[in-house]
A protein has these predicted regions:
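Mid-sequence acidic-hydrophobic segments that form the walls
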Residues: 164-167, 210-225, 243
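Inter-helical turn/loop segments and adjacent helix faces that build the functional surface
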Residues: 129-141, 216-236, 250-282, 298-315
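Terminal targeting/low-complexity segments that flank the catalytic cores of oxidoreductases
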Residues: 1-134, 138, 164-197, 201, ...
Length: 474
C-alpha cells in the first residue's frame, strides 16, 4: 500500500533514506511554485472530484473524492518488484534486471528519463488556460484529472533522478521546472510540447494522439533492464489510460454532435454547418492531420544509432517486447523504412536495430488507426458521406527521412509551390482556429449542461450521473 502519512506519499519506503527524503522535500516547494504559476489558471480554490492512487494493485488502486488541486497528494509509486525479473533483450539478455544504474549507461539513462520527464509538466503548461472555456463541468473535471496526473508523472521521473543520479539528477530535476512550453529562450525538449493548445478540440486531439505517444514510449521504457524505471513506467501506464479515454471520447462527442446537427438541419456544406454553431467535419480532419503529424515526429529519426544503442544496452525495448517471437537481439534482422528518392517515396529494408524508432511509430499508427475507425463509425451511423483518414506518415514532418520534403496526405511528393497552394486544405488555417475559438468564448459549468458543439458522454465518472457536481467553485 501507499504510505500517505509522510509529507511525500510513496511506496518506496522513502523514510529510510533521510538524505533522499530531504532532497525531495527541498524540491517539493519549487514544484508547488511551478504549479501555482503554470498549473490550471485561477483554479486553486476549486474542489474537484478527483481520483487519487491508494495502491499499485490492479483492483481498487484509486479512490475518488473532492480535492483542491494544490492539496493533491502527488507522490512516488512503483509497481512491486519481481525478484526473478531479467533483462529481456540486447547484449545483457538473461542477466538479472539492474537495481542500480550501470556506470557505463549513466548519462544515457539520465537523458532518457529527463526527456520523458520533460513532457509531463509541458502538457500542463499547454493546457492551463482551457478551464476558462470548458464545454461542461464534466469536461472541466477531466482536464484537471489529466493535469494532476501529469504532475504526478513528473514526480515519478524526479524520484528516479534524485535517487539514482546524485547531483546531476538534482540539477536536472530543477531544470524540469525551469523550462516552459513554447518559451523562446528555454523551451521544452520535444517540439510537440511547445505547440499551443488553444481550444478544446486541440486538447482532445492532443490527449488522443500525443498522450498515446506517451503510452508507447512508457511501454518501451517499461521493458527496460533498469528495473526501477520499468516499475515506475508500469504504474504510469495505469493512469495514462484515462487521458487517452478523454481524448478519444472528446473528439468522438464533437463528431457526434456535428452529425446530429447536420442530420437535423439537412446541411452538408461546411459554412452551413458552422452557421449552426458546431465544428464542421473538414475542420476536424485538419486538426487530426496536424496533431497526428507533429506526434509522429516525437518518435525521432527513422534510422537512429541512438535507438539501436538503447536497445542493445537493454535500456529501452520494443512495444510488448516479451511477447515478440524473435531472438530479442536483432543482430541480423531487417525492418522496412521509407524515404524520398527521386521525387518518390521508396521503401527499403535497413538493419532492424537502427529502425526501432520507426517500428515503435508503426505500432503507434496501427493503434491510432483503430481509434480513427471508431470515430468514422459515428459518421457512418449518422448516414453522412464523409471519411476521416490518417494522412501519409510523411505528411507535414519536421524530423526523420521526410523532413524537408512536401508530401500530400495521399503520399504524393510535391513541389514547395504546390504544397503552399494546398496547405490550408490540409492543415488548420488562422480562420479555422478563429472559428473554433469563437465557439469557446465562455464556459459551461452548470451541472448536466453541455456546450452546443459537443454531445454529452455516454456516462459519468465513477458511476456518477452527468448532472453530478464534479467541480465546486469556492
Amino acid at each position: 500500500m501507499i504510505n500517505y502519512t509522510e509529507k511525500i506519499p510513496n511506496n518506496v519506503d522513502l523514510g529510510r533514506d533521510r538524505i533522499l527524503q530531504r532532497a525531495l522535500e527541498h524540491w517539493q516547494p519549487a514544484y508547488m511554485g511551478w504549479w501555482y504559476d503554470m498549473g490550471p489558471n485561477e483554479s486553486h480554490n476549486y474542489e474537484v472530484y478527483l481520483r487519487t492512487a491508494i495502491s499499485v494493485e490492479a483492483d481498487g488502486w484509486a479512490q475518488f473524492d473532492y480535492v483542491k488541486m494544490p492539496e493533491y497528494r502527488w507522490g512516488i509509486f512503483l509497481q512491486p518488484r519481481d525478484e526473478k525479473r531479467q533483462v529481456n533483450f540486447g547484449i545483457h539478455k538473461g542477466q538479472a534486471a539492474w537495481q542500480d544504474v550501470p556506470g557505463e549507461y549513466r548519462s544515457t539513462l539520465r537523458r532518457v528519463i529527463v526527456t520523458q520527464g520533460d513532457t509531463e509538466p509541458a502538457s500542463v503548461e499547454q493546457q492551463r488556460m482551457l478551464g476558462a472555456s470548458c464545454p461542461s463541468m464534466y469536461d472541466l473535471r477531466n482536464i484537471f484529472q489529466v493535469n494532476v496526473e501529469e504532475g504526478r508523472h513528473l514526480w515519478a521521473m524526479v524520484y528516479l533522478l534524485h535517487r539514482y543520479f546524485g547531483r546531476d539528477g538534482r540539477e536536472e530535476a530543477e531544470s524540469l521546472l525551469a523550462r516552459r512550453s513554447g518559451d523562446a529562450d528555454n523551451p521544452r525538449i520535444l517540439g510537440a510540447f511547445n505547440e499551443p493548445t488553444p481550444d478544446w478540440l486541440a486538447f482532445y486531439m492532443f490527449t488522443f494522439f500525443t498522450d498515446r505517444d506517451g503510452k508507447f514510449q512508457l511501454c518501451a521504457l517499461a521493458e527496460s533492464g533498469f528495473d526501477p524505471l520499468a516499475r515506475t513506467c508500469r504504474f504510469m501506464l495505469t493512469e495514462e489510460a484515462h487521458h487517452m479515454f478523454v481524448g478519444e471520447t472528446g473528439v468522438g462527442r464533437i463528431i457526434q454532435r456535428t452529425c446530429e446537427v447536420m442530420k437535423e438541419n439537412k446541411v452538408e456544406d461546411p459554412s452551413d454547418v458552422r452557421a449552426l454553431g458546431v465544428i464542421d467535419l473538414p475542420t476536424i480532419q485538419k486538426y487530426l492531420n496536424f496533431h497526428y503529424s507533429v506526434t509522429l515526429d516525437l518518435y525521432g529519426s527513422d534510422v537512429s544509432s541512438n535507438a539501436a544503442n538503447y536497445y542493445t544496452s537493454g535500456l529501452k525495448g520494443r512495444f510488448r517486447e516479451t511477447k515478440l517471437d524473435d531472438d530479442h537481439v536483432l543482430a541480423d534482422a531487417e525492418y522496412p523504412v521509407s524515404e524520398v528518392i527521386g521525387g518518390k517515396v521508396i521503401t527499403k529494408n535497413v538493419p532492424a536495430l537502427t529502425a526501432l524508432n520507426e517500428r515503435l511509430r508503426d505500432d503507434y499508427i496501427e493503434e491510432i488507426a483503430d481509434g480513427v475507425g471508431r470515430w468514422q463509425r459515428v459518421i457512418d451511423n449518422a448516414g453522412i458521406r464523409f471519411r476521416l483518414t490518417l494522412p501519409h506518415k510523411g505528411f507535414h514532418r519536421a524530423i526523420g527521412n521526410f523532413a524537408g520534403h512536401f508530401i500530400s496526405p495521399d503520399g504524393e511528393v510535391l513541389s514547395e509551390e504546390a504544397w503552399k497552394n494546398h496547405e490550408f486544405e490540409w492543415l488548420p488555417s488562422s480562420k479555422d482556429y478563429a472559428y473554433v475559438q469563437s465557439l469557446m468564448s465562455g464556459r459551461v459549468v452548470e451541472p448536466g449542461k453541455f456546450a452546443n458543439w459537443i454531445a454529452p458522454p455516454a456516462r459519468g465518472i465513477n458511476n456518477q450521473s452527468l448532472n453530478f457536481e464534479y467541480v465546486r467553485f469556492n
